[in-house]
Each structure stands twice: as structure tokens, then as C-alpha cells.
Design a protein with these regions (language model features):
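Structural motif in protein kinase domains
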Residues: 100-110
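Conserved catalytic-loop aspartate of Hanks-type protein kinases
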Residues: 204
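C-terminal lobe substrate-recognition/regulatory segment of protein kinase catalytic domains
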Residues: 248-298
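Short beta-strand micro-motifs within the conserved protein kinase catalytic domain, predominantly
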Residues: 81-94
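Catalytic-loop of the protein kinase fold
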Residues: 134-161
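ATP-binding glycine-rich loop module of kinase domains
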Residues: 15-72
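Conserved activation segment of eukaryotic-like protein kinases, specifically the C-terminal portion
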Residues: 179-193
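Activation segment signature within eukaryotic-like protein kinase domains
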Residues: 122-123
Length: 329
């Protein structure tokens, strides 16, 4: 097992010193490390190896898939780049050497309320990252604030120049072709996934819309949990059922044939249909807290429970909502 102070050589010839393991389970897992390139003062990177669940006997397929995706997108500016690969040895597993970022979007969201310009700038960066993935016919599948890297965000006060905020999509391990299996974290999961439908690039747009809704809500009610973030107790299946029921009510899935008229999904709908005052209650709540009509209309368009009419990344980019006044370069 790797220990603090260990050194390993990458394919580039660079030698890296392992400083400390990172992550919530750093002591037991030790597959993600902060490392430093020897001979270069304060040149730090992130080293990421196979997880403990990855099958070594099969050559770490999950790691190999993520490595393949990193190489596929390595020249795309909106994806966190891989700078080197540390090959496996008789005693150690392979590790990707990744460019670091200062914090995740989740950490930035919890630092302070963001300005409207900051929110739109960051969300445009995330959308550009998704568009990069979508243009290759692939789906990111696990978009959440924790998978967005942020550098240059001032945690104490609004950035005077939002160009200083650099946004990158991180963690390419979940990128895949369109499918039907269960994907995404509960908070960011789209209705089509919750109800067992096939999904494509539009599921990423739903997740993107949930992030936007959470950032806008934090602007006016900083301590409030975001949409579907309050579902945090109980077993996974119990939480899934609670979220599915809430979504069926919030977006009136009973009235949409895709969910109500097909047996596999209709059986997952709650027994009691919501009353007219319950439908789109989330939008009413956000309006009462001060979210503008323009923002709410945009969210209603993006968070359309019908994936076939949800806007694409390109359509959102050209629609003008994300446009902000930028300072001169």
C-alpha cells in the first residue's frame, strides 16, 4: 500500500512524491492522492488509481474506462486534463496524474451566496463541458456539484472579474453511451431514470438544471437545502422512493403519457394523485423566496419531465439566458 513520502515514476519520466491521501475514506481507500513533481517546487497534481471495488483480476475495468475517457477528452478545455500516467508495477496499481483544482462547486456553493453573474458564468462553463461530451454521442451521467472543479473563486467576496473563475468537468469515469440502467446521484437524477425509461444526453441537462436551481435558491436562502437535497436519511431504496414520489408530484407525471400510460413506469407512480395546489409547488416556493420570473421560466423549460422536448446544450447556449456583461480582457 502506498505511504506518505513514496515516489513513483510516470510515463513522461517525471517522478512524483506522494504527499497525502485525499477523500472521505482516505485512510482505508488510498486510491486518490495529492502528489508533487520532484524537482519542481510546489507543482502539485492529483493521482487517482483504481477504487477498491474495481476488479484487479480483470485489469481494473472501471479504471481503464475512465482512463480511456480521459484520453478521449484530454484536449478539450472544459474537461479536467490528465497530464501523465503512472504505470502499474509488481506492487502498485496504475494511477492517472490529473491537474488539480482549488475546490468543487459544492464547496464554493457553501462558501457564500453567488452573484447572478457568477452563477451564469459557472453554469455556462459546466454546460460547455457537457456539450463537449454530447458532441461525441456520449452522456456524462453523473453531473453533480461535487464533480465540477472550480479555480479562482473568491470564498470571501464576489469576484470583481468573473473571468478569473475557471470551471472544469471532473471525473470522467461515468461517461457512457445512452442506455437504460440506473444512473446519477439521487438529487440530480432525471424523471426518466427514476421511472426506468431509456435516457440520453437530455438526462445531463436535467442534472444541470437542478444545479442551477440550487445555486439560485442559495442566492436568496443560503441555508436552505436545494431541490431534493433534503432527502438524506434512510436506506438507499427508501430515499429513492421518497424522491420518486416527490418528483411525480412536483412535475405532475400523472398527466404525461410517457410515465402514466406505460405499465413499467405507471406502477412506480404514487397511488394518490396530487392536487392542483401541489403541482409545481417547488416553483411557487422559489418565487415566494424571491427567485425572478425569468429564472423560474427558464428552470421550467430546462426541467421539463419530457426528455424529448428538454432543450439541448446547444439550444441553451444560443438562447441568451446565460449571457452576462463581461469586463474587458
Amino acid at each position: 500500500m502506498l505511504a506518505n513520502g513514496a515516489t513513483r515514476r510516470g510515463e513522461s519520466g517525471a517522478v512524483y512524491s506522494f504527499i497525502e491521501p485525499l477523500g472521505e475514506n482516505a485512510r482505508s481507500r488510498r486510491n486518490v492522492w495529492l502528489i508533487e513533481e520532484e524537482g519542481k517546487s510546489n507543482v502539485e497534481f492529483i493521482a487517482k488509481g483504481p477504487s477498491t471495488e474495481d476488479d484487479k483480476s480483470l485489469g481494473w475495468p472501471a479504471f481503464q474506462h475512465e482512463l480511456k475517457m480521459q484520453r478521449l477528452f484530454n484536449k478539450d478545455k472544459m474537461i479536467r486534463p490528465m497530464v501523465d500516467l503512472i504505470p502499474s508495477s509488481a506492487t502498485d496499481e496504475p494511477m492517472m496524474v490529473l491537474k488539480p483544482f482549488e475546490q468543487t462547486l459544492w464547496e464554493a456553493r457553501n462558501a457564500r451566496p453567488m452573484t447572478t453573474s457568477e452563477i451564469k458564468w459557472i453554469m455556462e462553463g459546466v454546460l460547455l463541458g457537457l456539450q463537449t461530451v454530447h458532441q461525441k454521442g456520449l452522456v456524462y451521467t453523473d453531473l453533480k456539484m461535487e464533480n465540477v472543479g472550480i479555480t479562482g473563486f473568491d470564498n470571501d467576496k464576489p469576484n470583481e472579474n468573473i473571468r478569473e473563475i475557471i470551471v472544469r468537468i471532473a471525473d470522467c469515469g461515468s461517461i457512457s453511451e445512452p442506455g437504460r440502467r440506473e444512473i446519477s446521484s439521487l438529487t440530480y437524477r432525471s424523471p426518466e431514470v427514476y421511472f426506468g425509461k431509456s435516457w440520453n444526453q437530455s438526462t445531463d441537462i436535467w442534472s444541470w438544471g437542478i444545479i442551477l436551481a440550487q445555486l439560485l435558491l442559495a442566492q436568496v436562502d443560503f441555508k436552505s437545502p436545494g431541490m431534493y437535497d433534503a432527502i438524506s436519511t434512510g436506506k438507499l431504496e427508501d430515499k429513492t422512493q421518497v424522491a420518486r414520489k416527490a418528483m411525480a408530484t412536483d412535475f405532475d407525471l400523472f398527466s404525461i403519457p410517457l410515465y402514466a400510460e406505460e405499465e413499467d413506469s405507471a406502477s412506480l407512480l404514487p397511488r394518490e394523485q396530487p392536487g392542483p395546489d401541489d403541482i409545481y409547488g417547488w416553483a411557487v416556493d422559489m418565487s415566494e423566496k424571491g427567485i425572478s420570473g425569468e429564472d423560474l421560466q427558464f428552470l421550467v423549460d430546462v426541467l421539463n419531465p419530457r426528455p424529448d422536448v428538454r432543450p439541448t446544450a446547444a439550444e441553451i447556449m444560443s438562447g441568451g439566458y446565460l449571457k452576462v456583461q463581461l469586463p474587458p480582457k
